[in-house]
Amino acid sequence: MTADKEEDAVTAGFLVIGDEILSGRTKDKNIGFLADYLTAIGIDLCEVRIVPDVTARIVEAVNALRSRYTYVFTSGGIGPTHDDITADSIAEAFGVGIDVDPRARAILEAHFPAGQLTPARLRMARIPDGADLIQNSVSKAPGFRIENVHVMAGVPSIMQAMLDAIAPTLKTGRKMLSRTVDADLPESRIAEALRDIQDAFPETLIGSYPRTTDGRFTTQIVVRSRDEAIMNRAADAVADAVREAVGQ
């Protein structure tokens, strides 16, 4: 579809890092939030990957995503424990060094009482060379940004706070608009017409979502475009096709 190739589109990839996500022990709550957040400010989330706490896998994913999209966001793996290896992996992906950052250390020293900035906690101040810090208003330990990669915590409340901190710095594109058409018929009855409408309106993205309503198969059709006039024409065509199919 051509809509996701528009020159004014700002794109993003999201990398979720953590064995606990892949094992099912922790249920991810960040993907949906980030998708909603980015859509609202005019950034298209185009790809999500989930990788384990394995340096080679993180490096591979980061390098693939950062070369493909305007922005990359990561969550997870920047805490104080031995398996929090995201910062080191990002440094390796960019080919830079990593050490305790004086700015990050000062933040942690101001946050923890005297004598409580343990070596484990100090790990959270290790930042790749050349990176900027991302403010953490919840628990203070910062995330960081290096080039187009934004590295954030996995805890949802902290990730959301970090996202709020970086949002003003992000370039945004024209927002994707949407209009919904409900069809009181199964998806198969409208599939061919939707394909024809999609071909007629290449600037749109048309998705159909089958549902069950009061024991009947129904379909919700969502038409998306950055151009409101084109979106409305395509949605009107969908509504006409639905009425015709219902009348058959």
Regions found by a protein language model. Give the residues of each.
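Short beta->alpha linker loops
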Residues: 50-53, 103, 122, 185
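Short coil/turn connectors at secondary-structure junctions
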Residues: 9-12, 67-69, 128-130, 139-141, ...
